[in-house]
Amino acid sequence: MLLGLAPRFLTGVTAPPAPIPARDGTPASSLLSVEQVVIGSRQPNDACDVDVLTLAWIVGRLDGHMDRRTMLLIAAGLTAEGAASLANPWERLTLALSGTRADQEDTVERLEARTIGFHRLEYELPAGALYQGLTSHLNELSALLHSAPERFRKRLAVTAGEAATLASWLAWDLKRPAQSAAFDRVSALAAKESEHPIIQACTHAYHSYALEGRPALEAVQRAQQFLPAQGEDATRAWLLCLEAEHLASLGDRQAAERLRQPEEAFDRARPHRERAWTRFLDAGRMAAFQLSVHVRLGDERQVTAAGQQALSSIDGDGDHKRLAVIYADIAQAQLQIGDIPTGITYVRRALDAAQRTESTWGLHHLGNVEKALASQRDPAARELLGDLISTRRALGSSPA
Protein backbone atom coordinates (compact mmCIF):
# COMPACT_ATOMS: atom_id res chain seq x y z
CA MET A 1 0.00 0.00 0.00
CA LEU A 2 1.37 3.41 -0.98
CA LEU A 3 0.74 6.03 1.69
CA GLY A 4 1.81 9.27 -0.04
CA LEU A 5 5.24 10.85 -0.22
CA ALA A 6 6.04 13.39 2.51
CA PRO A 7 8.70 16.13 2.46
CA ARG A 8 12.14 14.92 3.45
CA PHE A 9 13.10 17.92 5.55
CA LEU A 10 11.59 19.86 8.42
CA THR A 11 12.78 23.44 8.53
CA GLY A 12 14.02 26.03 11.00
CA VAL A 13 16.42 28.94 11.43
CA THR A 14 20.11 29.63 11.88
CA ALA A 15 21.72 30.18 15.26
CA PRO A 16 22.57 33.71 16.50
CA PRO A 17 26.03 35.01 15.50
CA ALA A 18 27.43 34.93 19.07
CA PRO A 19 26.67 31.47 20.51
CA ILE A 20 26.91 30.73 24.21
CA PRO A 21 29.39 27.90 24.96
CA ALA A 22 27.95 24.72 26.47
CA ARG A 23 29.68 22.23 28.75
CA ASP A 24 30.44 19.80 25.92
CA GLY A 25 31.58 22.43 23.43
CA THR A 26 28.35 22.57 21.45
CA PRO A 27 26.94 26.12 21.50
CA ALA A 28 23.88 26.18 23.73
CA SER A 29 22.12 28.54 21.34
CA SER A 30 22.67 26.04 18.52
CA LEU A 31 20.94 23.33 20.54
CA LEU A 32 18.05 25.71 21.18
CA SER A 33 17.81 26.44 17.48
CA VAL A 34 17.84 22.76 16.55
CA GLU A 35 15.17 21.99 19.15
CA GLN A 36 12.95 24.68 17.67
CA VAL A 37 13.65 23.36 14.19
CA VAL A 38 12.73 19.78 15.06
CA ILE A 39 9.65 20.79 17.03
CA GLY A 40 8.70 23.25 14.32
CA SER A 41 8.32 26.57 16.17
CA ARG A 42 10.64 28.58 13.89
CA GLN A 43 10.44 29.76 10.29
CA PRO A 44 12.28 28.02 7.42
CA ASN A 45 15.96 28.49 6.66
CA ASP A 46 17.92 25.85 4.77
CA ALA A 47 20.96 26.02 7.06
CA CYS A 48 19.05 24.37 9.91
CA ASP A 49 16.87 21.91 8.00
CA VAL A 50 16.80 18.61 9.90
CA ASP A 51 16.78 15.27 8.09
CA VAL A 52 14.30 13.43 10.31
CA LEU A 53 14.63 10.16 8.39
CA THR A 54 18.38 10.03 8.99
CA LEU A 55 17.94 11.22 12.58
CA ALA A 56 15.54 8.33 13.21
CA TRP A 57 17.99 5.85 11.66
CA ILE A 58 20.88 7.01 13.85
CA VAL A 59 18.77 7.12 17.02
CA GLY A 60 17.45 3.64 16.23
CA ARG A 61 20.98 2.27 16.13
CA LEU A 62 21.84 3.59 19.59
CA ASP A 63 21.82 0.95 22.30
CA GLY A 64 20.55 2.13 25.66
CA HIS A 65 18.98 5.27 27.06
CA MET A 66 18.96 8.47 25.02
CA ASP A 67 18.21 11.74 26.79
CA ARG A 68 16.82 14.85 25.14
CA ARG A 69 20.20 16.59 24.94
CA THR A 70 21.76 13.61 23.14
CA MET A 71 18.92 13.66 20.63
CA LEU A 72 19.43 17.38 20.01
CA LEU A 73 23.19 16.95 19.63
CA ILE A 74 22.58 14.31 16.97
CA ALA A 75 20.05 16.57 15.25
CA ALA A 76 22.55 19.44 15.34
CA GLY A 77 24.87 17.33 13.22
CA LEU A 78 22.10 16.47 10.76
CA THR A 79 21.16 19.86 9.39
CA ALA A 80 20.67 19.96 5.65
CA GLU A 81 24.25 21.14 5.10
CA GLY A 82 25.74 18.41 7.29
CA ALA A 83 23.60 15.66 5.77
CA ALA A 84 24.16 16.70 2.15
CA SER A 85 26.66 13.90 1.56
CA LEU A 86 24.16 11.20 2.56
CA ALA A 87 22.35 9.47 -0.29
CA ASN A 88 18.76 10.37 -0.94
CA PRO A 89 16.58 7.59 0.55
CA TRP A 90 15.00 6.88 -2.83
CA GLU A 91 18.45 6.55 -4.40
CA ARG A 92 19.37 4.07 -1.66
CA LEU A 93 16.15 2.18 -2.35
CA THR A 94 16.88 1.94 -6.07
CA LEU A 95 20.38 0.64 -5.35
CA ALA A 96 18.98 -1.88 -2.89
CA LEU A 97 16.49 -3.29 -5.37
CA SER A 98 19.12 -3.73 -8.08
CA GLY A 99 22.20 -4.43 -5.95
CA THR A 100 23.81 -7.39 -4.29
CA ARG A 101 22.44 -9.38 -1.39
CA ALA A 102 24.71 -7.38 0.93
CA ASP A 103 23.16 -4.15 -0.38
CA GLN A 104 19.69 -5.53 0.24
CA GLU A 105 20.55 -6.70 3.76
CA ASP A 106 22.00 -3.27 4.57
CA THR A 107 18.83 -1.55 3.37
CA VAL A 108 16.54 -3.82 5.40
CA GLU A 109 18.66 -3.23 8.51
CA ARG A 110 18.55 0.52 7.88
CA LEU A 111 14.75 0.48 7.66
CA GLU A 112 14.46 -1.64 10.81
CA ALA A 113 16.73 0.75 12.71
CA ARG A 114 14.81 3.74 11.43
CA THR A 115 11.51 2.29 12.67
CA ILE A 116 13.05 1.86 16.11
CA GLY A 117 14.36 5.40 15.92
CA PHE A 118 10.95 6.87 15.15
CA HIS A 119 9.51 5.08 18.18
CA ARG A 120 12.30 6.50 20.35
CA LEU A 121 11.93 10.02 18.97
CA GLU A 122 8.22 9.89 19.80
CA TYR A 123 9.10 10.05 23.51
CA GLU A 124 10.65 13.49 23.01
CA LEU A 125 9.10 15.20 19.99
CA PRO A 126 5.60 16.37 19.08
CA ALA A 127 3.64 14.20 16.67
CA GLY A 128 3.71 16.93 14.05
CA ALA A 129 7.52 16.89 13.93
CA LEU A 130 7.59 13.18 13.06
CA TYR A 131 4.45 12.39 11.10
CA GLN A 132 5.53 13.38 7.59
CA GLY A 133 8.91 11.71 7.98
CA LEU A 134 7.27 8.54 9.26
CA THR A 135 4.85 8.38 6.32
CA SER A 136 7.80 8.84 3.95
CA HIS A 137 9.53 5.97 5.76
CA LEU A 138 6.42 3.83 5.23
CA ASN A 139 6.52 4.70 1.53
CA GLU A 140 10.01 3.23 1.30
CA LEU A 141 8.89 0.11 3.13
CA SER A 142 5.89 -0.20 0.82
CA ALA A 143 8.01 0.08 -2.31
CA LEU A 144 10.52 -2.45 -1.05
CA LEU A 145 7.81 -4.90 -0.01
CA HIS A 146 6.51 -4.88 -3.58
CA SER A 147 9.90 -5.65 -5.10
CA ALA A 148 12.19 -7.22 -2.50
CA PRO A 149 13.32 -10.86 -2.64
CA GLU A 150 11.06 -13.27 -0.81
CA ARG A 151 13.65 -13.90 1.93
CA PHE A 152 13.23 -10.31 3.18
CA ARG A 153 9.44 -10.05 3.00
CA LYS A 154 8.68 -11.18 6.54
CA ARG A 155 11.24 -8.84 8.11
CA LEU A 156 9.98 -5.93 6.04
CA ALA A 157 6.37 -6.73 6.94
CA VAL A 158 7.26 -6.78 10.64
CA THR A 159 8.96 -3.40 10.54
CA ALA A 160 6.14 -1.99 8.39
CA GLY A 161 3.66 -3.12 11.04
CA GLU A 162 5.73 -1.62 13.83
CA ALA A 163 5.93 1.66 11.90
CA ALA A 164 2.22 1.67 11.05
CA THR A 165 1.19 1.28 14.70
CA LEU A 166 3.20 4.39 15.52
CA ALA A 167 1.78 6.26 12.52
CA SER A 168 -1.73 5.46 13.76
CA TRP A 169 -0.85 6.77 17.22
CA LEU A 170 0.64 9.98 15.81
CA ALA A 171 -2.38 10.50 13.54
CA TRP A 172 -4.65 10.18 16.57
CA ASP A 173 -2.49 12.71 18.42
CA LEU A 174 -2.85 15.06 15.43
CA LYS A 175 -6.66 14.66 15.39
CA ARG A 176 -6.72 12.76 12.09
CA PRO A 177 -9.01 9.80 12.87
CA ALA A 178 -9.43 8.64 9.26
CA GLN A 179 -5.67 8.41 8.77
CA SER A 180 -5.28 6.71 12.14
CA ALA A 181 -7.82 4.07 11.11
CA ALA A 182 -6.06 3.59 7.77
CA PHE A 183 -2.76 2.91 9.50
CA ASP A 184 -4.54 0.47 11.82
CA ARG A 185 -5.55 -1.49 8.73
CA VAL A 186 -1.96 -1.42 7.48
CA SER A 187 -0.67 -2.76 10.81
CA ALA A 188 -3.29 -5.53 10.78
CA LEU A 189 -2.26 -6.57 7.27
CA ALA A 190 1.40 -6.49 8.28
CA ALA A 191 0.70 -8.62 11.35
CA LYS A 192 -0.99 -11.21 9.14
CA GLU A 193 1.65 -11.10 6.39
CA SER A 194 4.54 -11.42 8.84
CA GLU A 195 2.81 -13.93 11.13
CA HIS A 196 3.59 -11.62 14.07
CA PRO A 197 0.18 -11.06 15.73
CA ILE A 198 1.92 -9.21 18.57
CA ILE A 199 1.78 -6.12 16.31
CA GLN A 200 -1.97 -6.09 16.91
CA ALA A 201 -1.34 -6.05 20.65
CA CYS A 202 0.48 -2.75 20.26
CA THR A 203 -2.33 -1.32 18.13
CA HIS A 204 -5.00 -2.12 20.72
CA ALA A 205 -2.80 -0.88 23.56
CA TYR A 206 -2.44 2.47 21.83
CA HIS A 207 -6.22 2.58 21.36
CA SER A 208 -6.69 2.24 25.11
CA TYR A 209 -4.95 5.56 25.71
CA ALA A 210 -7.71 7.35 23.79
CA LEU A 211 -10.49 5.69 25.81
CA GLU A 212 -11.81 5.80 29.36
CA GLY A 213 -13.31 3.39 31.86
CA ARG A 214 -14.60 0.02 30.72
CA PRO A 215 -13.87 0.55 26.98
CA ALA A 216 -10.22 1.31 27.79
CA LEU A 217 -9.95 -1.86 29.89
CA GLU A 218 -11.54 -3.91 27.11
CA ALA A 219 -9.05 -2.53 24.58
CA VAL A 220 -6.16 -3.68 26.78
CA GLN A 221 -7.74 -7.09 27.25
CA ARG A 222 -8.11 -7.42 23.47
CA ALA A 223 -4.44 -6.56 23.15
CA GLN A 224 -3.53 -9.32 25.61
CA GLN A 225 -5.20 -11.90 23.35
CA PHE A 226 -2.37 -11.38 20.84
CA LEU A 227 0.36 -12.25 23.36
CA PRO A 228 2.11 -15.60 22.89
CA ALA A 229 2.08 -18.14 25.72
CA GLN A 230 5.73 -17.32 26.43
CA GLY A 231 8.09 -14.52 25.51
CA GLU A 232 7.36 -10.91 24.48
CA ASP A 233 7.73 -10.04 28.16
CA ALA A 234 8.21 -6.29 27.67
CA THR A 235 4.89 -6.02 25.83
CA ARG A 236 3.33 -8.33 28.42
CA ALA A 237 4.54 -6.12 31.29
CA TRP A 238 3.24 -3.00 29.54
CA LEU A 239 -0.21 -4.51 28.95
CA LEU A 240 -0.47 -5.80 32.51
CA CYS A 241 0.40 -2.32 33.81
CA LEU A 242 -2.26 -0.78 31.60
CA GLU A 243 -4.79 -3.33 32.81
CA ALA A 244 -4.01 -2.52 36.45
CA GLU A 245 -4.26 1.20 35.69
CA HIS A 246 -7.70 0.88 34.11
CA LEU A 247 -8.94 -1.45 36.85
CA ALA A 248 -7.87 1.17 39.39
CA SER A 249 -9.77 3.83 37.45
CA LEU A 250 -12.87 1.65 37.85
CA GLY A 251 -12.28 1.37 41.60
CA ASP A 252 -11.26 -2.30 41.52
CA ARG A 253 -9.02 -2.88 44.56
CA GLN A 254 -7.45 -5.91 42.86
CA ALA A 255 -5.48 -3.47 40.73
CA ALA A 256 -2.79 -3.13 43.41
CA GLU A 257 -2.35 -6.90 43.56
CA ARG A 258 -2.19 -7.06 39.76
CA LEU A 259 0.97 -4.91 39.83
CA ARG A 260 2.99 -7.95 40.91
CA GLN A 261 2.43 -9.66 37.55
CA PRO A 262 3.94 -6.90 35.37
CA GLU A 263 6.89 -6.63 37.74
CA GLU A 264 7.61 -10.33 37.24
CA ALA A 265 7.27 -9.97 33.46
CA PHE A 266 9.51 -6.89 33.47
CA ASP A 267 12.21 -8.81 35.36
CA ARG A 268 12.30 -11.28 32.46
CA ALA A 269 11.97 -8.66 29.74
CA ARG A 270 14.60 -7.22 27.41
CA PRO A 271 12.85 -4.06 26.20
CA HIS A 272 15.74 -2.98 23.96
CA ARG A 273 15.79 -6.36 22.22
CA GLU A 274 12.12 -7.21 21.76
CA ARG A 275 10.07 -4.71 19.75
CA ALA A 276 10.41 -1.21 18.34
CA TRP A 277 7.68 -0.02 20.69
CA THR A 278 9.11 -1.60 23.87
CA ARG A 279 12.16 0.68 24.11
CA PHE A 280 10.20 3.07 26.33
CA LEU A 281 9.74 0.52 29.11
CA ASP A 282 12.28 0.92 31.91
CA ALA A 283 12.30 1.00 35.71
CA GLY A 284 11.16 4.62 35.66
CA ARG A 285 8.15 3.90 33.50
CA MET A 286 7.23 0.93 35.69
CA ALA A 287 7.39 3.24 38.72
CA ALA A 288 5.14 5.71 36.90
CA PHE A 289 2.56 2.97 36.32
CA GLN A 290 2.64 2.07 40.02
CA LEU A 291 2.12 5.72 40.93
CA SER A 292 -0.82 6.00 38.54
CA VAL A 293 -2.52 2.92 39.99
CA HIS A 294 -2.14 4.04 43.61
CA VAL A 295 -3.36 7.57 42.82
CA ARG A 296 -6.49 6.14 41.23
CA LEU A 297 -7.07 3.89 44.23
CA GLY A 298 -6.53 6.81 46.63
CA ASP A 299 -3.85 4.95 48.60
CA GLU A 300 -2.00 7.88 50.18
CA ARG A 301 0.79 5.81 51.76
CA GLN A 302 1.62 3.98 48.55
CA VAL A 303 1.34 7.19 46.52
CA THR A 304 4.10 8.79 48.57
CA ALA A 305 6.52 5.91 48.03
CA ALA A 306 5.63 5.44 44.36
CA GLY A 307 5.82 9.17 43.73
CA GLN A 308 9.32 9.39 45.17
CA GLN A 309 10.45 6.43 43.08
CA ALA A 310 8.93 7.87 39.90
CA LEU A 311 10.48 11.29 40.49
CA SER A 312 13.91 9.80 41.19
CA SER A 313 13.80 8.07 37.80
CA ILE A 314 13.20 11.27 35.86
CA ASP A 315 15.86 12.65 33.58
CA GLY A 316 15.42 16.38 34.10
CA ASP A 317 16.08 17.05 30.41
CA GLY A 318 14.23 14.19 28.80
CA ASP A 319 10.97 12.38 28.06
CA HIS A 320 8.65 15.31 28.67
CA LYS A 321 5.62 13.21 27.72
CA ARG A 322 6.39 10.93 30.66
CA LEU A 323 7.04 13.96 32.87
CA ALA A 324 3.60 15.34 32.07
CA VAL A 325 1.94 12.12 33.22
CA ILE A 326 4.01 11.72 36.40
CA TYR A 327 3.50 15.34 37.42
CA ALA A 328 -0.24 15.08 36.70
CA ASP A 329 -0.54 12.00 38.93
CA ILE A 330 1.38 13.66 41.76
CA ALA A 331 -0.75 16.78 41.36
CA GLN A 332 -3.94 14.74 41.56
CA ALA A 333 -2.71 12.99 44.72
CA GLN A 334 -1.83 16.30 46.39
CA LEU A 335 -5.19 17.82 45.51
CA GLN A 336 -6.95 14.72 46.88
CA ILE A 337 -5.31 15.13 50.30
CA GLY A 338 -5.93 18.88 50.35
CA ASP A 339 -2.39 20.15 49.74
CA ILE A 340 -3.52 22.75 47.22
CA PRO A 341 -0.25 24.74 46.84
CA THR A 342 1.82 21.62 46.10
CA GLY A 343 -0.90 20.29 43.83
CA ILE A 344 -0.94 23.54 41.85
CA THR A 345 2.85 23.43 41.52
CA TYR A 346 2.75 19.97 39.98
CA VAL A 347 -0.21 20.81 37.73
CA ARG A 348 1.81 23.72 36.37
CA ARG A 349 4.80 21.43 35.76
CA ALA A 350 2.60 18.84 34.06
CA LEU A 351 1.02 21.47 31.83
CA ASP A 352 4.42 22.88 30.88
CA ALA A 353 5.72 19.41 29.96
CA ALA A 354 2.59 18.62 27.91
CA GLN A 355 2.79 21.95 26.08
CA ARG A 356 6.47 21.45 25.31
CA THR A 357 5.73 18.33 23.28
CA GLU A 358 2.15 19.25 22.26
CA SER A 359 1.16 15.96 23.89
CA THR A 360 -2.50 15.03 23.58
CA TRP A 361 -1.73 12.08 25.85
CA GLY A 362 -0.35 14.42 28.53
CA LEU A 363 -3.35 16.75 28.31
CA HIS A 364 -5.69 13.75 28.35
CA HIS A 365 -4.03 12.63 31.59
CA LEU A 366 -4.64 16.09 33.08
CA GLY A 367 -8.39 15.61 32.70
CA ASN A 368 -8.89 14.33 36.25
CA VAL A 369 -6.74 17.16 37.59
CA GLU A 370 -8.90 19.63 35.69
CA LYS A 371 -11.97 18.22 37.43
CA ALA A 372 -10.25 18.53 40.83
CA LEU A 373 -9.28 22.15 40.16
CA ALA A 374 -12.85 22.99 39.17
CA SER A 375 -13.96 22.34 42.76
CA GLN A 376 -11.38 24.73 44.24
CA ARG A 377 -12.02 28.37 45.16
CA ASP A 378 -8.35 29.25 45.50
CA PRO A 379 -7.55 32.08 43.01
CA ALA A 380 -4.35 30.37 41.86
CA ALA A 381 -6.28 27.16 41.23
CA ARG A 382 -8.94 29.01 39.25
CA GLU A 383 -6.29 30.77 37.15
CA LEU A 384 -4.54 27.47 36.45
CA LEU A 385 -7.85 25.87 35.50
CA GLY A 386 -8.31 28.61 32.92
CA ASP A 387 -4.84 27.92 31.52
CA LEU A 388 -5.60 24.20 31.28
CA ILE A 389 -8.86 24.79 29.45
CA SER A 390 -7.35 27.29 27.01
CA THR A 391 -4.40 24.98 26.27
CA ARG A 392 -6.70 22.03 25.68
CA ARG A 393 -8.83 24.08 23.30
CA ALA A 394 -5.76 25.39 21.47
CA LEU A 395 -4.49 21.85 20.90
CA GLY A 396 -7.93 20.43 20.19
CA SER A 397 -7.93 17.94 23.07
CA SER A 398 -11.02 16.86 24.97
CA PRO A 399 -10.87 16.34 28.74
CA ALA A 400 -10.48 12.80 30.05
Name the predicted role of every residue range.
Residues 94-400:
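Conserved binding/catalytic microenvironments
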Residues 1-91, 386-393:
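Short amphipathic recognition helices of helix-turn-helix/homeodomain-type DNA-binding modules
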